[in-house]
From Swiss-Prot:
<feature type="binding site">
    <location>
        <position position="511"/>
    </location>
    <ligand>
        <name>Zn(2+)</name>
    </ligand>
</feature>
<comment type="function">
    <text>Catalyzes the attachment of threonine to tRNA(Thr) in a two-step reaction: L-threonine is first activated by ATP to form Thr-AMP and then transferred to the acceptor end of tRNA(Thr). Also edits incorrectly charged L-seryl-tRNA(Thr).</text>
</comment>
<keyword id="KW-0694">RNA-binding</keyword>
<feature type="binding site">
    <location>
        <position position="385"/>
    </location>
    <ligand>
        <name>Zn(2+)</name>
    </ligand>
</feature>
<dbReference type="GO" id="GO:0046872">
    <property type="term" value="F:metal ion binding"/>
</dbReference>
<dbReference type="InterPro" id="IPR012947">
    <property type="entry name" value="tRNA_SAD"/>
</dbReference>
<comment type="similarity">
    <text>Belongs to the class-II aminoacyl-tRNA synthetase family.</text>
</comment>
<dbReference type="InterPro" id="IPR006195">
    <property type="entry name" value="aa-tRNA-synth_II"/>
</dbReference>
<dbReference type="InterPro" id="IPR045864">
    <property type="entry name" value="aa-tRNA-synth_II/BPL/LPL"/>
</dbReference>
<dbReference type="InterPro" id="IPR018163">
    <property type="entry name" value="Thr/Ala-tRNA-synth_IIc_edit"/>
</dbReference>
<dbReference type="Pfam" id="PF07973">
    <property type="entry name" value="tRNA_SAD"/>
</dbReference>
<feature type="binding site">
    <location>
        <position position="334"/>
    </location>
    <ligand>
        <name>Zn(2+)</name>
    </ligand>
</feature>
<keyword id="KW-0547">Nucleotide-binding</keyword>
<keyword id="KW-0820">tRNA-binding</keyword>
<keyword id="KW-0067">ATP-binding</keyword>
<comment type="subunit">
    <text>Homodimer.</text>
</comment>
<dbReference type="Pfam" id="PF03129">
    <property type="entry name" value="HGTP_anticodon"/>
</dbReference>
Length: 642
């Protein structure tokens, strides 16, 4: 007679074993209809799972995040069902859930087209409309292997042979005549899978290994209802308009080319944004009392072996040889900063020592993962390392947190998710040291009034960390900032200081990044602002335009006055209609368009328009310079009204 305890603490007693679905039906028909799966004693299970003893149970529906993942996974099976009906010769590989959707890798003797994708989606809709039951059967390893071998599913057989223990009982999910294999759970009926969209196709090597066969990957998205699907597709459409690669080309910010994959060719306007970001962060470094240093971008393999990076990052490092020595181009800055710390005897009085660098790093990322500015091989980190005592951790981490929010707030990012990752099973250092370190990070977060998600076991082996994830205007997540404690690297590289007891001690090292990589952050900003960079970041802040040749000299004079005041301005003297000029510079996202006709020349003024189409009237030139300068210097805190 199992007693089922529900999330609200209420209990229900049954005279015999019951399934998750039985319990949902006992609560009410509405919940039974919505039930996708259950969480029994903390473990996700199918709705058909029998509960034979007392247990806690949460009914999972599509409104739950877990329910949405289950729904998406079942849509991957639905895709497999449709593929096998249209092209029975297809061999199915894997079909996992990803952010906002799913994909399936398939081996087919023809290349799929956009028309095929449309046909697949149509067949999926027709199958889902049948609202058929999904039947789960747990079978022996051998029985599962026999099923897929008989169907010619060589990839499923390989998964069984290489990834599933012989004493395991794989779950086979029956979608009418189609069978797929999965640990589950999956939806009990396809009525839950009506709101999906196939999106695109790409190539993917089997098991991600370029030595294996190239498969075809089909991507899709799935949601709980029509409204959610429509909203997501609208966000995708908006994201496409904001694509930094597209805007970067329109605004002539940068380019990339095949001869230097993953490396950025910055053009003048893009480099202007880059340097403004550097200047901004450099000002914050001074405000928060950092030293700025510069380390070499290439060091001997011996140093990377001592730091431990050679063992863990060798495949991602670019190397070269000279005079029988092997060198590696740095993938990160920390070992170099320890070398700078090691120059000269350090006392406890010298701590905390805060060391920052705009470090040029390189990582040999797989070519298939490269994506504009978001994923590159050559990048610049706004990296810092703080050497301190254990007693100083909380105060230093708290200052890092304040700096992170100070910087993000300037760019208008307010939705920031904070995660605290604690000790993993495999780690160095004593439990007491980890206790103190984790407590210091948690205390610093609380001190700054921040809520955080705890991620047990997700810290690095050398220390706990805090992660800061930005959510942009399209609610996409970008993990940028980190504050990471390191008990290992200083000791490995011989960093010590003399304590009050006149003994040598190894300092604690705090790795701190805010923007992460400047290249990636510029990509994020480009999409967040849709290219409408705030005035202080805009490559060209104002364009002065004459109406006729009579005002050309005056336009040049005004542009010079703006530039002399430290603003970035140009004069557009082309013999074009003023409306044409305004439209062109609006498309270039120039914040202010300054127009001068005979009236403005005579009055010593300038007519001001914004890129958003607002007519701000006429201003004396000196007054406008003062207003624009104030907006730039305050980084948008005091705006010229748009």
């Amino acid at each position: 007679m199992p007693i089922i305890t529900l999330p609200d603490g209420s209990q229900r007693q049954f005279a015999h074993a019951v399934s998750v679905m039985d319990v949902a039906a006992d609560i009410g028909p509405g919940l039974a209809k919505a039930c996708i799966a259950g969480r029994v004693n903390g473990e996700l299970v199918d709705a058909c799972e029998l509960i034979e003893a007392d247990a806690s149970l949460a009914i999972i529906t599509a409104k739950d995040e877990e329910g949405l993942d289950i729904l998406r996974h079942s849509c991957a099976h639905l895709l497999g069902h449709a593929i096998k009906q249209l092209w029975p010769q297809t061999k199915m590989a894997i079909g996992p859930v990803i952010d906002n959707g799913f994909y399936y890798d398939i081996d087919l003797d023809r290349t799929l087209t956009d028309e095929d994708l449309a046909a697949l989606e149509e067949r999926m809709l027709a199958l889902a409309a049948k609202d058929y039951d999904v039947i789960k059967k747990k079978v022996s390893w051998q029985e599962a292997r026999d099923v897929f071998e008989a169907r010619g599913e060589t990839y499923k057989v390989e998964i069984l042979d290489q990834n599933i223990a012989r004493d395991d009982q794989p779950g086979l999910y029956h979608h009418e005549e189609y069978i797929d294999m999965c640990r589950g759970p999956h939806v009990p009926n396809m009525r839950h899978c009506h709101h999906f969209k196939l999106q695109k196709m790409s190539g993917a090597y089997w098991r991600g290994d370029s030595n294996n066969k190239m498969l075809q990957r089909i991507y899709g998205t799935a949601w709980a209802d029509k409204k959610q699907l429509k909203s997501y597709l609208q966000r995708l459409e908006e994201a496409a308009k904001r694509d930094h690669r597209k805007i970067g080309k329109q605004l002539d910010l940068y380019h990339m080319q095949e001869e230097a994959p993953g490396m950025v060719f910055w053009h003048n306007d893009g480099w202007t944004i880059f340097r403004e970001l550097e200047t901004f962060i450099r000002g914050k470094l001074k405000e928060y009392d950092y030293q700025e240093v510069k380390g070499p971008f290439m060091m001997d393999r011996v140093l990377w072996e001592r730091s431990g990076h050679w063992e863990k990052y060798a495949q991602a490092m670019f190397t070269t040889q000279s005079e029988n020595r092997e060198y590696a181009i740095k993938p990160m800055n920390c070992p170099g900063h320890v070398q700078i710390f090691n120059q000269g005897l350090k006392s406890y009085r010298d701590l905390p020592l805060r060391m920052a660098e705009f470090g040029s790093c390189h990582r040999n990322e797989p070519s298939g993962s490269l994506h504009g500015l978001m994923r590159v091989r050559g990048f610049t980190q706004d990296d810092a390392h703080i050497f301190c005592t254990e007693e100083q951790i909380m105060e230093e981490v708290s200052a890092c947190i304040r700096m992170v929010y100070d910087v993000y707030g300037t760019f208008g990012f307010e939705n920031i998710v904070v995660k605290l990752s604690t000790r993993p099973e495999q780690r160095i250092g004593s439990d007491e040291a980890w206790d103190r370190a984790e407590a210091a990070l948690a205390e610093a977060l609380v001190l700054n009034g921040l809520k955080y998600d705890l991620q047990p076991g997700e810290g690095a082996f050398y220390g706990p960390k805090i992660e800061f994830t930005l959510h942009d205007c399209l609610d996409r997540a970008w993990q940028c900032g980190t504050v990471q404690l390191d008990f290992a690297l200083p000791g490995r590289l011989g960093a010590t200081y003399v304590g009050e007891d006149n003994e040598r001690h190894v300092p604690v090292m705090i790795h701190r990044a805010i923007l992460g990589s400047l290249e990636r952050f510029i990509g994020i900003l480009t999409e967040e602002y849709a290219g409408l960079f705030p005035t202080w970041l805009a490559p060209t802040q104002a364009v002065v335009m004459n109406i006729t040749d009579n005002q050309a000299d005056y336009a040049v004079k005004v542009a010079k006055a703006l530039n002399d005041a430290g603003l970035r301005a140009k004069a557009d003297l082309r013999n074009e209609k003023i409306g044409f000029k305004i439209r062109e510079h609006t498309l270039k996202r120039v914040p202010f368009m300054l127009v001068c006709g005979d009236k403005e020349v005579e009055a010593g003024k300038i007519a001001v328009r914004t890129r958003k189409g607002a007519d701000l009237g006429t201003y004396p030139v000196e007054e406008l310079i003062a207003l624009l300068t104030q907006e730039v210097q305050t980084r948008g805190q005091k705006k010229v009204e748009e």
